Curated annotation (Swiss-Prot):
Main function: Involved in protein export. Acts as a chaperone by maintaining the newly synthesized protein in an open conformation. Functions as a peptidyl-prolyl cis-trans isomerase.
Gene that specifies this protein: tig
Name under which the protein is recorded: Trigger factor
PROSITE patterns in UniProt: FKBP_PPIASE
HAMAP family in the record: Trigger_factor_Tig
Amino acid sequence: MQVSLETTSGLERRLTVGVPAEQVENEVENRLKQAARNVTIKGFRKGKVPLSVVKQRFGAGIRQEVVGDVINRSFYAAVQKENLKPAGQPSIQPKQLSAGQDLEYIAVFEVYPSVELSDLSVFEITRHKAEVTDVDVDNMIDVLRKHQATWTQVERAAADGDQVNINFVGTKDGVEFAGGKADNQNLILGSNSMIPGFEAGLVGLKSGDQKTLALTFPEDYHSEELKGAAVEFAVTVNSVSEAVLPELNKEFFQKFGVEKGGEKQFRKEVKANMERELGNALKAKVKGQVMDALVASHTVDVPKALVANEIQVLRNQMLQRFGGQQQNFDVKSLLPDTMFQEEASRRVTLGLIVGEIVKSAKLKPDAKRIKSMIEEIASTYQEPQEVIDYYNSNQELLAGVESAVLEDQVVDHILSKAKVSDVDSTYDDVIKSKAQR
């Protein structure tokens, strides 16, 4: 086999491969003989079909299969010979495929870049410390009660936290705009469900009151037509209702899966869930800083093929989130590559950097941490042991956990080198900052 390598630009390589005709013809001959033993043709007994007949009927197809197999095998043999690591599938350009002549083709592909790690000791990371207090638990229970609240109509002015039923019509320059009209719409004042100023403008109104609100849409509003636009909403209040919170009793606790132990057990489980959420948020906060520092401190030439693959992954994830059926619309038109380009490039960049850290630090997934992570995932289900068994028997899920654990180990490795400052914080501050990321 003859191989010549050319660096065309950046990460792109051009490999010219030549395979002796004898090798190809021998393999074609062997495939024809194998087909002759197995093929059934009318007028001949199975296994007794003349080779000339098989060649006439199936020769072209068999040759095509052999050429494909030879190209595939010879390509990977060639990249091993040249110590190359292809990133993505090659583009194959045939040069010579004629029978009886050496097979020759050109493979164009990208290779993985070399990543030179920066000095991890200069990273400055802020590690927040927080605990779940009794006050935090009280506040969370209040939130849970509000989620289970019932509403009773009242004959008084609306206040923050009340639910109003309204009709409204929005206009821009005196003309109604799309999506700006609704009848019998329930709205909790203070929920920030509407644009700034809308809910505050209804505080103090009673059933039957009418009011025109002069407001401005935010500059970052999703509709291009309404970004930063001055509008008016003509609002009619149909009714005002106040929340009636449920009592902390057995019926309430059962709604959250607490059958025994009363309020003490309920508080215990609420606190455990909050601690789990807080722990994950604290971990994510540190991890986010570490990953940002890695991206900022490294310049990596990312293979276009890997970015394209990651774009497709992100597009599929978005489709799954919104329940989109690909056959019903032009996916690439609705969700173009440009929508995911930046995030995909970042993910590929991080993957390459993290991979190099794993290699240089000789990190391997820690079995105890894998077990612990699976148990933590399982603890949120009604039958934890079934979930644990399912993860341990599913190689794809297990690989996902191993990857997550290895990434956590990379973060720990970086923290052991970096300048880390501990800062006291609160449950609310940590959880709010997580929601804003």
